[in-house]
Structure formats: structure tokens, C-alpha cells
Amino acid sequence: MRPSPPPAAPAAEPVPPWLRSLPVAPEFRPTAAEFADPVSYILKIEPAAAPYGICKVVPPLPPPPKKATFSNLSRSFAALHPDDRSPSFPTRHQQVGLCPRRTRPGLKPVWRSSHRYTLPQFESKAGATRKSLLAGLNFPASRQLTPLDHEVLFWRASADRPIVVEYGSDMSGSGFSPCAAQPQPPPQQQPTARAAAHLGETAWNMRGVARSPGSLLRFMPEDVPGVTTPMLYVGMMFSWFAWHVEDHDLHSLNYMHLGAAKTWYGVPRDAALAFEDVVREHGYGGEVNPLETFATLGQKTTVMSPEVLVESGIPCCRLVQNAGEFVVTFPGSYHCGFSHGFNCGEASNIATPEWLRIAKEAAIRRASINRPPMVSHYQLLYDLALSMRFREPSNGEMETRSSRIKEKKKCEGEQLVKKMFIQNVIEDNELLSHLLNDGSSCIILPANAHDGPGLSTLRSTDQSNMNSRISHNLCSREEAPEASGCLSPNRNGDTRNCISSDTHNMEGDKGDIMSATGLLDQGLLSCVTCGILSFSCVAVLKPRDSTARYLMSADSNSINNQLSISGGSILADAPTNERNGVISRPYSEHCCNEIMADDAEIDKNSALDLLAFAHGGQPDPEEDPLEKILKIAHGINKSQPNSSNNVGCVGTKLSSSSTERQERPSSQNAHCNGSSVISNGPKGVRTRNKYQLKMVLSEGFQAKDIYSAKEKKVQSEPSSSKGDVKETIDVSGTENDVGCKSTTISVSEHRGSTKNMYSVKEKKVQSKPSSLKGTVKETVDVSGTENDARCKSITISVSEHRGSTPMTNSLAASIVKPDKDSSRMHVFCLEHAIEVEKQLHAIGGSNIMLICRPEYPKIEAEARLLGEEMGLVYDWKGIHFKEANMEDRQKIQEVLRDEEAIPTSSDWAVKLGINLYYSANLAKSPLYNKQMPYNRVIYRAFGCDSPNDSPVMFNTCERKQSHQKKIVVAGRWCGKVWMSKQVHPYLAHRVESQEAEEADRICSYHFDEKHKAEPVGNSSRVEASKRKSSSLTDVTESSNRRGEIPGEETNTKRPKHSQENNLRALETAAEVVVPSPAGTGLRVSSRIANRANKLKSKMEKEDVPSSRPKSNIKEKSSHASGQKSNVQEANANSASHLRAMPPKQKAEAEAKKQIRTPKPPKQAVEYSCDIEGCSMSFRTKRDLSLHKSDICPVKGCGKKFFSHKYLLQHRKVHTDDRPLTCPWKGCNMAFKWPWARTEHLRVHTGDRPYVCHEPGCAQTFRFVSDFSRHKRKTGHSVKKKKKAKS
């Protein structure tokens, strides 16, 4: 019997076609001279490597000695856990494989391992794991595998049954020796300096590469692990790092010390939004919205094969990193990879000047998921630009520069930084000039000694040093509790490093006030709309009282509808004084930035205060006097929640006689204007960092009221003071004159009555037809419910009626004191401050306070000098600054307290749809699994289509094609030219959006030049609200160009083929927000540029002003003659063309010209629904089919309904149809649903139908949501009682 032959060796795993055709990222081999400066070299290769997303750099020097590397690694591991005897490190378990039960196949489980390894132990563990993995894949361990073989096996294992590997990641430390203390020699001395022996002696040493010269991260005030200091990574075979993008879209530098290779995959930044959409659909099952997709990708647990990306039209590339090589990832590029075996590497971030182009957008996207910012890109820009400006260094961080080197060696990065610095200061100057049109001042914060070197040079020597600021550089969730811990009160109740809110004593608050001087550094004053940390200037907006009253009684939908109406104010009684088209704010000449401006001052011991105190109320020194009178004349609203008071007084005379006053504590809480503490909620939530509060809310905690009421006491007089005190106060109201002209209120205070009763003794109304005069007398017996009485009777006599017109409830609602949420102060960047002020102007107006850094005037002066040196011309506006006094500092404290509050639906910024944090938290709700709640900033940052936006058709972009198919190039990525039909729809849309942006730029420039000589009218603030572009543009051009505020209603019909309509279409495009993927950075093609130049020249020729006025007839005749001349010119051109033709072709052309007749215009085909009772029609059959299947055909919605009737009602959501109007006289609100109108009517009628039947409670509620919340929080449930009885 023959022995059986030995088993044949397994054949090599076939490489799939998608992997074989995957582009390879570029590899660069710099010379020793190029390798000297890492930032300059990365900036040099960035234009060629950024379209790949990643690249490899092979250094010209050998790696450090292995002995020194192992020694440095051991010291780093020992520093992680000093208690351990051996230098060990922890690991994490990672799953490789596919679990069929998971609804989100892209998410891989990761959990912390209980084992700790030294480096040799983990190397042996990695070897054993490699053998078991290859055995499971039917490969012998002795066989040598190529990088492609590793990739094939990894993706095959990812689709097979789950296996577990270990990975040591995110460990602070480095394998390089510490950097030398002495600075690098200047460039002119480098040739004579000693040459570096190995990589550790160069500027590419990972311990200091983040703070190398030219990197913006060198100006970060404190070290952040993984960003400014390196982190170590130790892996084994198939240890993976998930798809992710760097924090703030920074560059990253990754070095491999030793071991097996790593495979990297990269997606360029231009395709980032398309990548996220593919991950959402294929990796997460399409059950999350784009915002949650971005947040989930930030958790670094998403692994998905590049095969899915390639099939979806996403550019993707690969590279293999070996020991001793660097991998550079560029801003905004997604990347992932895995290890081929045991290896050890480290990574750190850098920031070249090119990062500044996209830093703003990256900060907005980070703020959209409520992640705290680690750095302000404006701060880094200012520090780097000013460090280049000054010749003499203020400390050791800046380099000395000779004038000769500066003239001869002007780095491209330096020029870019200086231009962006000047552009940013110019934009701030332009916006400040528009916000300060009324002659007010910009408040300068007190100086803080903790700034960058460039800003420290600007400080004068006599400024005092302040307390050290709180670092806002939180790099992980683990650091968040530590940061909040240092900001919370200690056991003794003293608050450290925060502004005290427990006292009104200014002497006690002085230290806390001074601690607020570094607000712009601490990141506490970030824009509510976009989340940007404004480094130089911020604006604080607070709605006026009339605006706040309207915001209290309206919902967000009605407000947005009213804001969309152009011209006029919503409130008839809104005091909107205008001067030269600019909102006139109630400022005085001495204090121009008042936030709380009272119309009249009342003494604390006035009769109004005494009477209010007699009714159990708390006298408020800052309360409006008219509101005090209303509280007195209409009883105690809190005691009668079901009553509805109709009041309309303009002038009021009140006289009171007080026999005795006593101090009595009040059982009611009043709103606190000057101080507040965070009392509600779980322990440990008291923190100065608002991002921690937003994080608490996102985890399910929602505070009842972030502001607790504080009691105010009234000083009591001695009992022996029995003399009568009378005083008469005349108050002029600012509201409508509906009721009486004058009112006399007589108050007598006596003691002895203990009952609480409200009885009308006498009411007489006498009127004469001639004089229209009448008298009303009311005697009301009022007694307090506690201790002793305050008033025996109140007599109100009314005379001199203007008419018999009844007083309306709308006036009573307009005089109610606004609540905290409707009058809260919010911080905005200057750009969004103008937009928000325009919105508030439509419903009553707002008050503004502008705050800037103490050195900002000098920064502006340096920008002027730098602009003159670079030859940039700009007409600088004069800005008036003033030092912050104690009153301004109190307001800044109030701003900080308001910023601490967790946003709720009653916040006025939420109702206007401009609160980024609220929208981000709302997007986490299960109601928004597939579609985000609309927020203009978030939609723009994540490339989503606005519900109200539709594409604009451009005749200028059309070119008649005969039979040749139009070929559109989408872009060039990963070394390949991609057509529009080969890429993802997000990328295919880039050409259209690029043309729209180009048309926007041309038209804005054209119309700005046209109206440059005209005076600035009502649109001055609108013109100033142009979006501050993150990309570098010509400063002279950007200073003259002002766009329109997006979001306005535009005409989206297809215009006719005429030159005037072309201009109209371009003008429309300048106002429409064209939804496009964020981060588009393609160069404009020559075709678009040429067409833009031709169109621009045509418009400039047409706008030449006429030398003399002409009549309409002459204009028409000249227009007709111009058309005639154009026709003659066209005929002449056609005739010359015919003469050049051969005789036969000429005859055929003439015959065709005679026979040719104009074709009728094509009509759009509509597909109507034939279901009974439905009259809807659609453009495509697909939409009609979905509609008949009771599925919403609107893109991004796709909701399914049980009947066609509900689908027709759902249409109101997209069309914003509001057929139901409020029947109350004077109210213009409209509603989509009947229940919404029913609940709104209760605001007018005062009806509170929901009563809590819990013994001892008896609270009433107006809305069922409030009643449900009350039962849920207190446990007062009727069902529990029924169960208990049964």
C-alpha cells in the first residue's frame, strides 16, 4: 500500500480586484536640508499629498539606537503606573469579525483588558496570537506574507466569525529621548552646526515636533496628550485603529519605532461628508442622522472595508508603513489601519498654516456634537502672526530675525499667516463698525497675564498680574470630571476659579470679578450660534422687554414665519426707534453698553414697594414701575392663577398712607436679576464649564430651573413710627394707550385683619356722550395669609376715559414681566451677532454689549502696520473703546451665569432656531434618528439640504449641446480623475455648488462696486453680516465685498433666456444657501472662470452711469435701438459666415434658416395622484409611487403612514402650512394642528384645566406636558391610588 502524499501547501489567497486597483498613497524622500524643518516640508508637500488624505515620509537619517528606544519606552510605561515594579502597560480587547445579530455591522466591540504586559511579554503574546490566527485561516505560521496577503486575510477575517486581539493604545510617552534644552540654530547658522547623527537629534523628534517653529500648536498654553505631546501604541497582528478624523481636523504625524508593518487607508477631506454618509447607510444601518454618525465615528470603534467605499464612489487609497518611517495625515481626512504583527509606534499632532483654512469649519463641527474645544484657532493665528511681526523676542520661544533674512527669505507659510491675520482683523473692524453705528463703545476686559508670547509683547509693563486661568484643553472624557472638579465648590462652600453668585456685595465679589478677565481665553464666551471660541471680540445680546414678551407667548414656528416677512415689525407696540436705518439702542453717552436700562427710577421705600410688599410680593429695585402698578392694581396673580386681568394704563398716580410696616419673609420666590446659583440637579453638576452642563443634558439630565430664586428682605421700621407717609408718583408707560389716561390709587394700611378675601364693594361707571368721562370706584379688602395684614382697602378711581373701547387681553399680555429664558443674555461672535440682531429687530429689538480683549486696540494697530508693509489697502474704521468699570464686570458675571444655563425650549435663542447646543442635544432624540432638526449652521456644516432651499437654475451655465453628451469632471483624488457619474452624489454635486459660489462671488462684488458711492441705509447691518470665509482671499477684495444673510425667501423658478434674467438668477443665487458638502476645496475650472470673467465684464459695461437724465420714451427707444443693432450685428455675423461657406452648404443653410420656426417651450410634466380627496402632483413617477404607498416622498423624510389622510396632514410639516388661526382679537398666530391652537388659547383665557388631585398639592397646569412632567417628577399619579385602593 502506497503512503499518502503529504498535503499540498495552501495556495496564495487571491487578491480581490478592488484591493489590487486601490491607489497607493505617495511616498516622499526629503533631503537633509528639506528634512531640517518638519512644518515647512509638510507645507511643501501638502498640495500634492492632501488629495490622497495620507502620505509616507522616509527620513534621510537612521532611527535612534534600539537600546535607547527600549529604555525610553520603559521609562514611559513606568511613568504610567509608578506603583508597579515593572514598566507595564494596559491593553484593550478588540473584536475582529462580523456578528450577524448586530444591526450596526460597522461598530466593533472594544473593552479594557484585565492584563498588564511589559514590552517583552506583549511581544511573546503577539507571537502566539499570530500563530493561532494564521492556523484558523489555514496558513502556516512559517510562511512569509506580503502586505497584500495581510490585507486579504484581515478583511476576510473581518467578514468571518468574531475573534479577539489585544491593542495597547493612547498611552502618554515617547520612544525618543527628551529634546535638547537649547533652541535650534538660526537658518543662517545651520550649515556650520553639527550634523544630526540620527532621527532623535532632529526637529522630527516626536517629543517636540508639535511645538516646532512654524507649528501653530506651539502657542497652546498647556500640553494635551496626543496633541502637543506624543502617545504610544503597541499592537499585534490584526490590531486595528478605527476610521476617525483628528481632533479639530489637525495634521497628525505617526512614527513607527520597531516591529512589523502597518497598513493605512485614507480618504481625502473633500470626500469626508460622502464617507460619513456611506458609513451611516452601510455601517450603521441608516438608523442614525449625520450628526450622530459624526459623533459615533469620534468614538473610534468603526471598522469598515474600503471595498464598500470604492463601490459607493468614495476616493480611497492605501499605504504600508515600515519601521523608521513617518505617516502624515492631512486635515479632515479619515483614516484607519491595522498591524501585521507586533510593533510599537507613537503619534502627535501638528498644525501648519494651511490648517487655518479649515479650522473654523472643524470647530463648528466639533461644537455641533457638544464636544468641548481644545484650542481657539483665532488665538493660535494671532500669536503666530504677532510672533512673526516682532523682531525682539519676549521669551525664549520666538526666533531672532535679521532684516536681511526677512527680506530675502519670506516663507510661504509666513505670508499665508500674515494675510489671514490681517483679513481677520479687517473683518472684525468692519463688523464692529456696523455694530457701533450709534456711537457706543466697545468694553475692554481687564488684562490677564497668561497669554501667548505675541500677545504678551503688546502688554504694557504696568498691568497687574491676574490669577491663572482655567485650562479648557480637555482632550478626552476622562479629563472632564477633573476639570469640573477644580471648578466646583469645596466643603467650606468657597468657590475656586469661578465667579461667585451667592452675594451682592461687590467687595466680596471683587476677587471673582477679576478672575473673569480671561474669559476669552478660557473658552467660556463661545458663540451660541456656531460654538466658535471668539478670541478677540464677542457680542452679548439681550432681547428688549417688548421682544421678550412676544417671545414668551409665541412658539418657534410662528416666530420663524414672522421673521420671514420682510419689512415692518411684528409687534404693534414694539418700541423700535430707528436712526439712519440703524437700531437705536437705549444707551446713554456715559454708559453706552447698558444691558439693563430702566426707563424710570423708583425709590426703594416708595408707596409702590410698600404696597407690593403688603400683598406678599418682593420689591425689586430694577423692576419696571409700570409692571409694579399692574401687580398692585390687578391683585396677586400668583394667588389667582385662573384669573385673567385686562389692564391698559398709561399714566398712573398712586398715593399711599402707611401707618406701620413690619418685616415679613415671603413664601414666594422672585426672579433674581443680579445673582443666581445652580441649586437643582444632582450633586457635582455645579461647574463653571458650560460644556459639562451640555454633556450632562445629553446624558439624560435636565434641570428644572438652573436659576434658583433668592429672597430679598425689606428693612423694617420701628413700631413707633405712626406718622402717615404719602407720596405721589407719576409714571409714563411705553405701551399702547388703550385704557385709562390717569388712575388714582389710594392705599391705607391697618393692622388686625386675618382673613384673605377679595370682594368688590362698589363699582360705578358713569359716562356722558359729550365728554366721554366716567368714574370707577372699587373697594377691595385684602389681607395677607400670614401673621398680620397689610391693607384694609384699596380704592381705585378712574376718570377721563378716552372712549368706551374695551381693553384687550393682548395688551395685558404685552405688559407681563418677561421671564428669564425670554430675556437671557447670550454670547455671539460678531458675524452672527448682526444676523441675530436683525431677527430680533423684526420683533422688537435688542440690547448689545461688545467685549474685546485688553490688547485688541494694539492688535489692530499692528495689523495696520503689517498691512502697509505688505501693500494691502483698507479703509480702517474708527472704533471707540472704554475700560470696563465695576458695573460692566457685574454684567459680565451675569453673562457667565446665563451661559451656564442648560438651554430649554423656552429659551429665546432656541425659539429663533439659533442655539447650536440645543439642536445638538435634540438630534440625539429617537425622534430624529434619520433626519436632524433644522439648524442652519449644522445643516451647512454637514452638507444637508435645507427644507426651504431648492437649486437655482443658471442660464449662464447652459450651453446648447447637439448630440454630444456632456462630460463633467467631479475632481481629482488619489491620483485619479473622477467623473460625476463615478463618485458619490455628495461629490457629484460639487461642480454645481462651485458654480453657484462663483456666481455669488461675482454678483456680490459687482453690486458692491455699483453701490459703493451710495449712503448706507437699512441694509447696512445686513451687508455686514457676510459669512467670514475660512479660506484665504484677497484682503482688498474681501473688504469691499458684502454678501446677504442666507435663509431669505427667493424665487426659484427657472428664468427665461435673457440677459436680465441671467443677472436676476445670479442675484438670487447670492441669497440662497446652496447645500454642498462641507470642506470643498477644488480649484475653479477654466471654463467656469472664463464664463465668470465674461459675465463680470458685461455687467460692468452695462452699469456705466449715464451722463444726463433721459425720459422713459428715450430709454425705451434706446433699448429698442440697442436690440435692433444687436439683431443687425447678428445678421451681419451670420451673413459673413454664409459667405465663407461652400455654395452647396450655403444654399442648404439658407433653406434651413427660412424653414426654421420657433419651437414651443417645453412644459414640465406633472404626475397627479388619483386617490379620492387628494389633489397633489409630483415631478417624477417615483415620488408619485411613494406617495400612493403612503410614504412621504420628501428627500430625507420617508415616513410611512397607516392611511392616506395622515399623509396629507403630514404635508403641513414640509410646506409649513398653517391654516388654523388664533380667534383672539389682535393675535396673528397660526397653527398646523388643532391641539396647538387649543393650548395657545389658554394663554389668552388663562384657563388651567389640569389639576393635580394629590392631597396637599392642588397645583393647576395650562398644558398637559407640564402636568405630565409634574406627575413624573413628584410621583403624584392617580393610577397609583387606584391600584392601592384595589
UniProtKB/Swiss-Prot annotation:
Plants over-expressing JMJ705 display a leaf lesion-mimic phenotype in mature leaves, have high levels of biotic stress-responsive and defense-related genes leading to enhanced plant resistance to the bacterial pathogen Xanthomonas oryzae pv. oryzae. Residues 82-105, 641-686, 1013-1060, 1077-1164 are annotated as: Disordered. Induction: By salt stress, abscisic acid (ABA), jasmonic acid (JA), the ethylene precursor ACC and infection by the bacterial pathogen Xanthomonas oryzae pv. oryzae. Its cofactor is Fe(2+). Transmembrane segments: none annotated. Residues 641-679, 1119-1136 have a biased composition (Polar residues). Residues 25-66 form the JmjN domain. One of its GO terms (biological process) is positive regulation of growth rate. Disruption phenotype: Reduced plant height, panicle length, spikelets per panicle and spikelet fertility. Increased susceptibility to the bacterial pathogen Xanthomonas oryzae pv. oryzae. Residues 201-367 form the JmjC domain. Its EC number is 1.14.11.68. One of its GO terms (cellular component) is nucleus. It catalyses: N(6),N(6),N(6)-trimethyl-L-lysyl(27)-[histone H3] + 2 2-oxoglutarate + 2 O2 = N(6)-methyl-L-lysyl(27)-[histone H3] + 2 formaldehyde + 2 succinate + 2 CO2. It comes from Oryza sativa subsp. japonica. It is found in: Nucleus. Histone demethylase that demethylates 'Lys-27' (H3K27me) of histone H3 with a specific activity for H3K27me3 and H3K27me2. No activity on H3K4me3, H3K9me3, H3K27me1 and H3K36me3. Involved in biotic stress response. May demethylate H3K27me3-marked defense-related genes and increase their basal and induced expression levels during pathogen infection. Pfam families: JmjC (PF02373), JmjN (PF02375). Fe cation binds at residues 244, 246, 335. PANTHER family: LYSINE-SPECIFIC DEMETHYLASE, LYSINE-SPECIFIC DEMETHYLASE REF6. The lineage of its organism: Eukaryota, Viridiplantae, Streptophyta, Embryophyta, Tracheophyta. One of its GO terms (molecular function) is zinc ion binding. InterPro entries: JmjC_dom, JmjN, Znf_C2H2_sf, Znf_C2H2_type. This is Lysine-specific demethylase JMJ705. Keywords: Chromatin regulator, Dioxygenase, Iron, Metal-binding, Nucleus, Oxidoreductase, Plant defense, Repeat, Stress response, Transcription, Transcription regulation, Zinc, Zinc-finger.
